[in-house]
Each structure stands twice: as C-alpha cells, then as structure tokens.
Amino acid sequence: MLVFIDADTILPKYFIQSFENRVNEKHFQAGSFTQKMDSDNLAIRAGAHFMSGYMRLMQYTPWPIGFGCLYITIEAFNAVDGFDESLYIMEDYDIILQAKRAGYKIGIIKMGCLASDRRYKNNSLHQILRGIYGELYRYTHGLRITKPIYEYNMGGEDKDNSKDTDPSKQKFK
C-alpha cells in the first residue's frame, strides 16, 4: 500500500494500526482520509468539516475524490499509471477517480488527521471560492484540469515572499 500525506499534516497516534485495520476490514484499494483543521478560526474548521463530509459523500458517486492524505495499492497505482503530471491541479482527485474507473474499491476513512490552516489564515474566503470554482470547472469542463484556471502556488509558496510559509517550519497549536 502506498500512502501520500501532505507535509503539513499530523497523524493520530495509532494511525498505522487503525489504517491497516480499516482497509483490511473493508477491502479498500484506494481512497483518502478525513482531516480536521488545526485552527482557532471557526469558519476554517467548519470548511474542513464540510470538505471531509463532501469527500465521504462523493465516494458513493461515479466521481469520487480524495485530497490531502491518500492511499492506494501498488497494483492500483500502477494500473492507472500513477499521478498524471499533465494536470495543473487536483491530481489527488484524479488518481482516486481513475482507480474507481479501473474497478478498484474506493473508501474514505475517518481518521482525524490534523492539517495546518496555513493556506487559509490570511485568505480563507479566497481559498474557499477557488475550491468551489475548481469543483464547478471540473463538472462543466471535464473532470481533469490540465491548464491554469487560476494562479496556484504549490506547497505554500508565497509569491511576495513576505512571510515564510514552508510547511516544515509551521507550528501546530
């Protein structure tokens, strides 16, 4: 099993044991983990809760999604040729969709991984609107976004370099 976890995520104490138990119990072959947002801001925490619920709902549709923390069997990863590097954004959504289309069992596991709010602290409304726009774009222009639809700074890069957003230097509350 391959597990991909965002750099700014803290895993629960018994993550590996719990993860293995849930995957083996349900026979999941690809999917994602729910996340909680480490934030003092109620709106940011509520947004993360909504997105976890949305992700869990989408696993039962023809268009499952996963983000932040993903898992996939090596067999499924190879069958879908891994992450598609031609995608501009949402490659994590795409690999889960491709695994489902290839016949692999998808599951969203409720794990309580703790994610940093660093991307949302200063521009949460902007981030939320971009996320909604990205979702609407996917469903109206095809599920694969291969061209820039908005500016996206990978890994928390700050375009004006006025503050350090390196995830390895972030502190959790």
Predicted region positions:
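Short beta-strand-to-loop acidic/aromatic patch adjacent to the donor-nucleotide binding site
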Residues: 1-10
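Short glycine/serine/threonine-enriched helix-capping/active-site loop
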Residues: 4, 31-34, 109-111, 115-116
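Conserved donor NDP-sugar-binding/catalytic core segment of glycosyltransferases
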Residues: 13-43
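Short, flexible, basic/aromatic active-site loop/helix in glycosyltransferases
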Residues: 32-68
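Conserved nucleotide-sugar donor-binding
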Residues: 66-80
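Short aromatic/basic micro-patch
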Residues: 71, 89, 107
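Acidic donor-binding loop at a coil-to-helix junction in glycosyltransferase catalytic cores
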Residues: 89-95
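Hydrophobic helical membrane-anchoring modules
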Residues: 100-173
